[in-house]
Amino acid sequence: MPGYSDYIIRNASGLIPMVIEQTSRGERSYDIYSRLLKERIIFLLGEVEDHMANLVVAQLLFLESENPEKDISLYINSPGGVVTAGLAIYDTMQFIKPDVSTLCIGQAASAAALLLCAGAEGKRFCLPNSRVMIHQPLGGYRGQATDIEIHARETLAVRERLNNIMAKHTKKTPDQIMRDTERDNFMSATQAMEYGLIDKVLYDRQVAGHSTDL
């Protein structure tokens, strides 16, 4: 990587690599994710929950403010998680002006699969050995019978909303999405492309429009 040292160091936690940038003013260190953010790459890694969603939303808004015309790349490796957290990211992706290109590395399951298919049309990708899984939202409730009934109605309403969103991005009917998500539905990268969740399986960096210069 031009302009960078040939090694990485690790921060105090020993978990996140640091890169050293050589500039005319000396050296400057970044954690690897901050450095990639400069290239308009956001990582969605691990469980989708409120804290992670807030970080992703903040990065999307920041990159829009930096350049509202340039694409943003969202790299996904996630088992899914909280529906409301996933929808917060989804709504922000649709709200901001830049196109958001999505790329599955590893897995995109549940809410993460929804975010994968919500990328800009023609800019949704999987690496060849990625796995994608779609299913209906999960819920388990305890308490008074009336409260359980309220939560059950909410779960059904959320399911209908998610089916409509996925139908929009896959060009399938909500009824078909409902049938296909009745149980955990695992797909290979090629199957996800055939289903309409992504546009292409990437085997190398040849696709234009993705941040491929690192």
Curated annotation (Swiss-Prot):
Localization per record: Cytoplasm
Active-site residues per Swiss-Prot or TrEMBL entry: 110 (nucleophile), 135
Pfam families: CLP_protease
GO biological process per UniProt: protein quality control for misfolded or incompletely synthesized proteins
Listed Gene3D superfamilies: 2-enoyl-CoA Hydratase, Chain A, domain 1
EC number, as in UniProt: 3.4.21.92
SUPFAM superfamilies registered for this protein in UniProt: ClpP/crotonase (SSF52096)
Top-level division of the source organism's lineage: Bacteria
Keywords tagged on the record: Cytoplasm, Hydrolase, Protease, Serine protease
GO cellular-component term (any): cytoplasm
Catalytic activity as recorded in UniProt: Hydrolysis of proteins to small peptides in the presence of ATP and magnesium. alpha-casein is the usual test substrate. In the absence of ATP, only oligopeptides shorter than five residues are hydrolyzed (such as succinyl-Leu-Tyr-|-NHMec, and Leu-Tyr-Leu-|-Tyr-Trp, in which cleavage of the -Tyr-|-Leu- and -Tyr-|-Trp bonds also occurs)
A GO molecular-function descriptor: ATP-dependent peptidase activity
Enzyme class (EC, first level): hydrolase
Keyword Hydrolase: yes
InterPro entries: ClpP, ClpP/crotonase-like_dom_sf, ClpP/TepA, ClpP_His_AS, ClpP_Ser_AS
Family: Belongs to the peptidase S14 family.
Known partners and oligomeric status: Fourteen ClpP subunits assemble into 2 heptameric rings which stack back to back to give a disk-like structure with a central cavity, resembling the structure of eukaryotic proteasomes.
Biological role: Cleaves peptides in various proteins in a process that requires ATP hydrolysis. Has a chymotrypsin-like activity. Plays a major role in the degradation of misfolded proteins.
Name of this chain's protein: ATP-dependent Clp protease proteolytic subunit
